[in-house]
Amino acid sequence: ICTGISVAIAAVIVWFAVRYKNLWAAVLAGVQVVGTLILEFMFSHGIEVPYGLYFDSLSLLMTFIIGVVGSGICIYALGYMEDFQAHEPEGAPDRRPMFFALMFVFLSAMYVIVFSNNMEWMFTGWEVTTLCSFLLIGYTRTEEAVANAFRQIIMNLAGGIGFLVALWCCALTVGTFSFYEFLVIGQNNPALTTLAVTALAFAGITKAAQMPFQTWLLGAMVAPTPTSALLHSST
């Protein structure tokens, strides 16, 4: 399932990249999906993660934050998007259902990230948030919105490749995709997990829009205000 979702996401990104003639987005999406497919065929069937989900006090705290903040943004978006649509040119299609669908899918993917003990599950949630962010930032389809959406997707795909490198490191060095087992191994033998942790840190920096990747989040402010609020709060 995770591999199928990854392929579908890459296909959507490549379609937009071809449509808007953005080579970097297409190349990075291609690299990511090829790396994912090779990883799946080489290792995934031989690596079992007994517990796909993991609950602790920190994950429950994050659930509360996502639920409260995310729900508040969605409620605010109801009125905002009604006014937004009213200011659209006469006869313009009402795309609010797609907007709210993307918001809800984004929040759902965040829950997957928070609760996943399986690194592949987390990676899938990670990719879903990347695609949703791209579509939300480019919602208005203006030239500026499209340019900023591609800036986001390029930086986030680079981070996704960093996450993929971490998965490869885990498969080759520690032989597990379980976060719990990974942490135990890291405590007992830090050298085995150093490269994977470094790759995960790079992925986190890009997703959180930390320097020098902060420009994609600033570009999100061209989107409707609920999008900007959602992305700023989630990072």
Can you name each region flagged by the protein language model?
Residues 1-235:
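...captures the hydrophobic TM-helix bundle architecture rather than a specific catalytic motif
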